[in-house]
Swiss-Prot record:
Protein task: Catalyzes the reversible phosphorolytic breakdown of the N-glycosidic bond in the beta-(deoxy)ribonucleoside molecules, with the formation of the corresponding free purine bases and pentose-1-phosphate.
Source lineage: Bacteria, Bacillati, Bacillota, Bacilli, Lactobacillales
Keyword Cell inner membrane: no
Protein name: Purine nucleoside phosphorylase DeoD-type
Binding site for a purine D-ribonucleoside: H5, E178, M179, E180, S202, D203
CDD domains, per the entry: PNP_EcPNPI-like
Subunit structure of this chain's protein: Homohexamer; trimer of homodimers.
Key words, A-Z: Glycosyltransferase, Transferase
GO cellular component terms, semicolon-separated: cytosol
Length: 234
């Protein structure tokens, strides 16, 4: 039965899914990596597809920007469609001198400026961490593919313009800043499913380097390959 934001019927979404923020990136992945891809959602323009990758049934769906948006879709995917493995594939801004444009960052844990956890646990800070099994798989897959990859803490900010001081954040060893992973990791803990964030550095906050919107939408294929290989890894 469709949800308020996803029009798919039961069985039309695989139990393993990639979650790019940009719905057009979801379309790109479906068209370039999946076989026999079928669209299951276009509500609010948030495109979703199910197909096969190397013989394994997988789905891909956009989530929009920010923790509130990804939380809506992830909640419905988990509770209504039985998705068990969710991997965010998106972009991030580096706050570390050793993390460069187009490098991959795998978020081991995600600090956040969001109050998402405080709504459930107002008296203490709950750590948002990735599923270790998925993280370990993704790291070794990226390493085997020869892709420059960094593993460490990230920051999920509620603000795209403004937010915490990038220099101070970087001095704490944070690799990058993005806007969604902490929400996804929290839902992973809440519902006991596997979650992970794999990001491509699209901008360097310290140096001002950046990539184009077209490049962000249509390239960054290393991240997509690592995400798909991790989705199907046993």
């Amino acid at each position: 039965m469709p949800t308020p934001h996803i029009e798919a019927q039961k069985g039309e979404i695989a139990d393993k899914i990639l979650l790019p923020g940009d719905p057009l990136r979801a379309k790109f992945i479906a068209e370039n990596f999946l076989e026999d891809a079928v669209q299951f959602n276009q509500v609010r323009g948030m495109l979703g597809f199910t197909g096969t990758y190397k013989g394994h049934r997988v789905s891909v769906m956009g989530t929009g920007m920010g923790i509130p948006s990804i939380s809506i879709y992830a909640n419905e995917l988990i509770t209504e469609y039985g998705v068990k493995r969710l991997i965010r594939v998106g972009t991030a801004g580096s706050v570390n001198e050793d993390v460069h444009i187009r490098d991959l960052v795998i978020g081991q844990a995600a600090a956040t400026t969001s109050a998402i956890v405080r709504h459930d646990f107002p008296d203490f800070d709950f750590p948002q961490i990735a599923d270790f099994d998925l993280l370990d798989k993704a790291y070794h897959i990226a390493k085997d593919l020869g892709i420059t990859t960094h593993v460490g803490n990230i920051l999920s900010s509620d603000l795209f313009y403004g937010g915490p001081d990038a220099v101070k954040v970087g001095k704490l060893g944070v690799k990058a800043v993005e806007m969604e992973a902490a929400g996804l990791y929290y839902l992973g803990a809440k519902y006991k499913v596997q979650t992970l964030g794999i990001m491509t550095i699209s901008d360097h906050i310290l140096t001002g380097e950046s990539t184009t919107s077209e490049e962000r939408q249509l390239t960054f294929t290393d991240m997509m390959k690592v995400g798909l290989e991790t989705l199907i890894a046993e």
